[in-house]
Design a protein with these regions (language model features):
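Short surface loop/edge beta-strand patches of beta-sandwich-type extracellular domains
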Residues: 427
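N-terminal accessory segments that position/regulate proteins before the catalytic core
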Residues: 1-422, 430-481
Length: 481
């Protein structure tokens, strides 16, 4: 972790013209509790520059700073490293010409990389005509060196965690405005990389997200469009390649359209159930989803006090809702949740499992004993034990890999990231807090007596301080160190 070789937090393209995005984005979405419960009916709003700006800012925008070298984004990220970039494939967005754009969060603008309608080519790569017929697609890419600089090979997992967490925000904002969205995790990797002008190794595609309802008539057949010609800025003085990261990423790649079709049609038997909607808590208030996103920040200190029941039951229900992704069959999830409950009103301390419904007690234990266990499972980080409860999102990897092949591991990590992002938003909706934590992989499985492997750990509880909300586009809140 050489400070002189630290990766740049933002990618730019030299010479690319920048289109400023609207900065006046008052919170106008539905109440956060209703949104996170999936209770906002779709209204299919017209996508214009303001709605696009809203989607980008509240998922990947800069909301806080601490000096000129430390930036915080709207979504959580392991180590605050944010190994992701977002590209916009614009077809029918009011006020923007069709083309390929790159989101530059530090200036809150779109870099215009290539003109023309790239949706047909993206639809070809995803083997999905709805991509060509949707007004907008956002493509999320991962830059493993940005997180491997600190976490080495383990950082590859962080790319998919962080993508899920970021898209939890995007899904919430879209739902809060009645905008239909769908995530594609199946695509020809090399074709999407080529369209974006990235090499597929130091930067690779992670997810394709269509926004808006597809029109009845799809765009034209793919035509050969020139790739972006603007060179990217260097990521760091001497980026380091990790051979294991490259091998793991390439092991899950799909190389043909037939591969994508077959992978997407894979049947995985016995997946847990997931619902699309849950009941919203009555006392949660009417705070818009955007305001909650601005208040959210990784909680650094928690009080060991009794938490209200809805912080466990509603927050976990909201977090485990169906994810609208091609790889996850409707009404199912790849995850189970092993939950260490410490202090929640009406819930006995102990180890619980949440799968196919509310959490079920597996092993009761004294509060202090559970707190000590949770802290140990989280590499002795105090927040793991100071929380009201700590959720360990797990996946049966034998089941996942049998059905999805090597690419299935990406899907499980991604879905865990979505659940983690939703869980934190739900906690902040109720006026509480949460944070992601590192964990000891095998120890989690052993402690809960499960064959499933831990994908991600999230501590949820009562903050010991009042967090300061982030600022609007172009005016991030400045924090003191």
């Amino acid at each position: 972790m050489d400070p002189s070789n630290r990766p740049q937090p933002f990618k730019r393209h030299l010479g690319a013209p920048v289109h400023p995005l609207p900065r006046d984005l008052p919170p106008t979405g539905a109440p956060a509790a209703v949104t996170l419960s999936g209770r906002v009916p779709p209204s299919d709003p017209t996508i214009d520059g303001e709605l696009l700006a809203r989607l980008l800012f509240y998922s990947a925008g800069v909301t806080r700073t601490a000096g000129d070298d430390l930036w915080f984004r709207a979504a959580a990220s392991a180590g605050n490293l944010h190994p992701l970039e977002v590209y916009a494939v614009v077809g029918e967005v009011a006020g923007l010409d069709a083309g390929l754009y790159h989101f530059a969060p530090e200036v809150f603008g779109l870099e215009a990389l290539a003109a023309g309608d790239h949706r047909p080519a993206l639809a070809d790569a995803t083997v999905d005509p709805d991509v060509a017929a949707s007004p907008l697609a956002l493509v999320v890419t991962g830059l493993p060196w940005r997180t491997a600089w600190k976490y080495a090979e383990r950082g590859w997992r962080h790319v998919y965690w962080d993508a899920g967490t970021m898209l939890a925000n995007l899904l919430a904002v879209a739902e809060g405005h009645g905008l239909p969205v769908r995530v594609r995790l199946g695509f020809v990797d090399a074709a999407v990389s080529r369209l974006l002008g990235v090499d597929g190794v130091t930067e690779f595609p992670v997810a394709v997200v269509t926004c808006g309802r597809p029109t009845a008539t799809a765009a034209a057949e793919p035509v050969e469009l020139p790739p972006p010609q603007f060179p990217p800025t260097p990521l760091s003085p001497a980026p380091v390649d990790f051979p294991l990261v490259i091998r793991v990423q390439q092991a899950g790649e799909l190389t043909t359209g037939d591969d994508v079709t077959g992978w997407r049609a894979a049947a995985v038997a016995g997946l847990p159930r997931a619902t699309d909607t849950v009941d919203a808590p009555v006392a949660a208030g009417s705070e818009p989803i955007e305001s909650v996103i601005l208040r959210r920040g990784s909680t650094r200190r928690m009080r060991r006090q009794l938490a209200p029941a809805e912080l466990l039951h509603w927050a976990m229900a909201a977090a485990t809702r169906q994810v609208p992704a091609d790889a996850i069959p409707t009404g199912t999830t790849l995850l189970s949740h092993e939950v260490a409950v410490h202090a929640v009103h009406g819930t006995e301390p102990g180890l619980y499992q949440q799968v196919d419904g509310p959490p079920q007690l597996r092993r009761p234990a004294p509060e202090l004993k559970v707190r000590t266990l949770s802290q140990g499972l989280c590499v002795d980080q105090p927040l793991g034990g100071d929380s009201a409860y700590t959720d360990f999102a797990c996946a049966d990897l034998d089941q996942v890999l049998d059905g999805y092949g090597e690419r299935g591991y990406r899907v499980a990590q991604f879905e865990a990231g979505v659940a983690a992002g939703r869980l934190q938003l739900a906690a902040f909706t109720l006026g509480h807090g949460g944070t992601g934590l590192t964990f000891c992989d095998q120890d989690v499985s052993d402690a809960f007596g499960t064959r499933a492997a831990c994908m991600l750990a999230i501590a949820i509880g009562l903050p010991a301080y009042r967090p300061k909300p982030g600022g609007p586009p172009g005016r991030p809140r400045r924090l003191t160190r």
